[in-house]
């Protein structure tokens, strides 16, 4: 079994004046990978059929996940103690899950069943792709004894799943698109 993971984050903040105008730019990435191998043997004796079934099965499981995002925000003072903020983020994520099963049923000893290749009926390979856009617009009021904000967020998302190995590899699923939106209100005294 092997597992790897790597993540990173980069941020830049720049004040454009002393009244509250500023800009923020950020980026994130992540990668993880894992692989597991397993081996099993079974022997089944069928008394009524007077036969024996010997199965040796080797399974190689792999998964990996990759993601990255970029974001930017801009804050503008509009009048005393009040600021408008505009923020945008794009995020992409890809996930792979693969399980390749190699079978030796009665006649194929190890390692010959590797040469025959994996069993398509028992194996799978699925890739999922996700894209998310997020746009926020808000106004904030900051006072010595209280803080408040109101805004709205729009989040269009798309997802796609592709199966290239296994019994469902002939099914082509459509891309799914969703638009979420949410108002926000905050008051702190």
How does the language model describe each region?
Residues 1-189:
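Primarily recognizes Gram-negative and organellar outer-membrane beta-barrels
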């Amino acid at each position: 079994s092997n597992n790897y993971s790597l993540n990173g984050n980069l941020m830049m903040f720049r004040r454009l004046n002393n009244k509250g105008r500023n800009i923020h730019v950020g980026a994130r990435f992540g990668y993880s990978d894992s692989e597991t191998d397993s081996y099993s043997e079974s022997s089944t004796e069928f008394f009524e059929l007077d036969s024996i079934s010997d199965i040796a099965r080797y399974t190689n499981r792999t998964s990996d996940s990759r993601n990255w995002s970029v974001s930017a925000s801009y804050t503008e003072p509009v009048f005393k103690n009040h600021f408008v903020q505009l923020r945008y983020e794009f995020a992409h994520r890809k996930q792979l899950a693969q399980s390749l099963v190699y079978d030796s049923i009665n006649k194929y000893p190890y390692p010959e069943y590797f040469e025959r290749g994996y069993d398509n009926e028992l194996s799978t390979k699925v890739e999922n792709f996700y894209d998310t856009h997020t746009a926020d617009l808000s106004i904030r009021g900051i006072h010595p004894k209280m803080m408040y904000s109101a805004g709205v967020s729009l989040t269009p998302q798309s997802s796609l799943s592709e199966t290239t190995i296994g019994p469902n590899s002939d099914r082509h699923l459509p891309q799914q698109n969703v638009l979420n939106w949410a108002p926000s209100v905050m008051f702190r005294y």
